[in-house]
Amino acid sequence: MLNVTHQLKKKLFLSDLDEKSSSSPHDEKKPGDGREVREEKSKRKALPALPSPAEEKSMNLSIARQRSPSGSSPEQVKAYGPFFLEYTLMAEYNQLRSQRLPGVYVLPAAKSALVWYGVIFIRMGLYQDGIFKFQMTIPENFPDGDCPTLVFKPTIFHPVVNIETGELDVRRAFPRWRRNINHLWQVLLYAKRIFYKIDSRDPLNPEAAEMYQNDKDRYKQKVNECLRRCHNELHLAVADDPHAIKFVELTPEKQDDVKNQIIESQSKPECLPTANAHKSGLSWMKKGGAIFSKEES
């Protein structure tokens, strides 16, 4: 009974407060109070109205202009494309050098930075002692375009390599090239791993896949034939480019030439430790000089 009485009193008290607040002089409209009422309403917080489709389109265009280089037209931005691509490829090549993939050697072409020549050495497994030359071609809209293409020259006998063209199935490992996530050194690493872990699912060379699954001895024979063919064509360049990798027979005369070049390069002043004394920790002070000394004028 006491609880019911308390609740009734509470309701009456709240209703009385509502009546007082509604009848307060601040809410009454009186002559000359229009300015105060407008100022009171202007202080209230209100959400902005939703923009119309036309307004939203205008806002998006404004944001796009702010993000683009100031004062640059699309033609001007496009003109810088080759420089952006060049710096991107330089960064990719530096990443490749830092990875130091064993048995993989790559050199960009002299005529185009979008073409890289390379060779892979295989030291164990079914393809042991294999030396496979390849050419990797990078799309012009890299890194926003498709995957690079990698072609073995000469072609090799492998389930994921086209027997006619020598092209590696790069999309098997990179279905969609993702900027800042996928890198060129990963493509080269994948090209090396296919010789150690052979995947015969969805092959580019069905004959090689079927033979690998059902007749390993016959598969090994075909691989040995492939190795001999690649060894016989090592002296041939994959393209007419000064940077295309090719092998030459090492004769005693050529060996002496290489040895002399190494000796001469080590004897040059820039190769000596004193050439970079500030980097090696050597003192730059003159012999006999004192610390904090000053010549008298």
From Swiss-Prot:
It comes from the Eukaryota. Gene3D superfamilies: Ubiquitin Conjugating Enzyme (3.10.110.10). Residues 84-232 form the UBC core domain. It holds the Pfam family UQ_con. Residues 17-42 have a biased composition (Basic and acidic residues). PROSITE patterns: UBC_2. SUPFAM superfamilies: UBC-like. Residues 13-75 are annotated as: Disordered. Residues 59-75 have a biased composition (Polar residues). PANTHER family: UBIQUITIN-CONJUGATING ENZYME E2. Belongs to the ubiquitin-conjugating enzyme family. FTS subfamily. This is Protein AKTIP homolog. The lineage of its organism: Eukaryota, Metazoa, Cnidaria, Anthozoa, Hexacorallia.
